[in-house]
Curated annotation (Swiss-Prot):
Acetyl-CoA carboxylase is a heterohexamer composed of biotin carboxyl carrier protein (AccB), biotin carboxylase (AccC) and two subunits each of ACCase subunit alpha (AccA) and ACCase subunit beta (AccD). GO terms for cellular component: acetyl-CoA carboxylase complex. Keywords: ATP-binding, Cytoplasm, Fatty acid biosynthesis, Fatty acid metabolism, Lipid biosynthesis, Lipid metabolism, Nucleotide-binding, Transferase. This is Acetyl-coenzyme A carboxylase carboxyl transferase subunit alpha. Its main location: cytoplasm. It is found in: Cytoplasm. Residues 1-242 form the CoA carboxyltransferase C-terminal domain. The lineage of its organism: Bacteria, Bacillati, Bacillota, Bacilli, Lactobacillales. Pathway: Lipid metabolism; malonyl-CoA biosynthesis; malonyl-CoA from acetyl-CoA: step 1/1. GO terms for molecular function: acetyl-CoA carboxylase activity; ATP binding; carboxyl- or carbamoyltransferase activity.
């Protein structure tokens, strides 16, 4: 199979048939109980989360939810969270800390919502607060990019002990279209921009920005989704078992150094 270009990966990352956060939760975890609302303003349906079990042990799972079709995407705001979505995520993560549950996040967003209402309600502050709190959260955190990882809207759920990416996903400070518009004043050069930006899982693993790439193709053939789900489940169990052996001080120091090295 011919090697995929960065633009090919962008297309695959945005594909509407990619599994959503809720579908991964259903496939990997048991006993999921969804929580709603940020306790300040509203329940942002672009962010989902709650408590589940993994191999019989409680975990908190949080993720950004896109829709499968136009009505679902309208309901989920096309996976672009408002500030109340990030505040809901933080509420669940602080609850996880209180009850000593590890946190697993799933990221798939083009970026945080940039509407007037979102800005008025403190979109930037909500993202910044998540970065601050996650950096010092006293339980293990694993973040997985399952589609698009766009800008601060993605990073707000990805300050983790380990960040993983599925093979055909992207993680970037902005979209290739945005990059081309800013650099060349020509959004039509997005394909060219994608090749320069180093946004694919393979490139980011080489740069040590991400810690693990979950394969979606093996021996030139697409892997069955069920096999990808099993790989993720086993990897979660293995890594959480490893992180659970660390005392809190060591866990936080390693997390700090992980981001400090950039």
């Amino acid at each position: 199979m011919e090697k995929k270009t960065a633009n090919d990966v962008v297309t695959l990352a945005r594909a509407q048939d990619r599994l959503t956060t809720l579908e991964y939760i259903e496939a990997i975890f048991e006993d999921f109980l969804e929580f709603h609302g940020d306790r300040y303003f509203a329940d942002d349906l672009a962010v989902v989360g709650g408590v589940a079990t993994l191999q019989g042990k409680p975990v908190t799972v949080v993720g950004i939810q896109k829709g499968r079709n136009l009505p679902e995407n309208i309901e989920r705001n096309f996976g672009s969270p408002n500030p109340e979505g990030y505040r809901k995520a933080l509420r669940l993560m602080k609850q996880a800390e209180k009850f000593n549950r590890p946190v697993i996040t799933f990221v798939n967003t083009a970026g945080a919502y940039c509407g007037i209402g979102a800005e008025e309600r403190g979109e930037g502050e909500a993202i910044a607060q998540n970065l601050l709190e996650m950096s010092d959260l006293k339980v293990p955190i694993i973040s997985v990019i399952i589609g698009e990882g766009g800008s601060g809207g993605a990073l707000a759920l990805a300050v983790a002990d380990e960040v993983w990416m599925l093979e055909h996903t992207i993680y970037a400070v902005l979209s290739p279209e945005g990059f081309a518009s800013i650099l060349w004043k020509d959004g039509s050069r997005a394909k060219e921009a994608a090749e320069l930006m180093k946004i694919t899982a393979t490139e980011l693993k080489e740069l040590a920005i991400v810690d693990k790439v979950i394969p979606e193709v093996m021996n030139g053939q697409p892997l069955e989704q069920a096999k990808i789900n099993r790989m993720l489940q086993k990897a979660f169990i293995s890594k959480l078992t490893e992180l659970a052996k660390l005392d809190t001080e060591t866990l936080l120091e390693k997390r700090y150094q992980r981001f400090r090295k950039y």
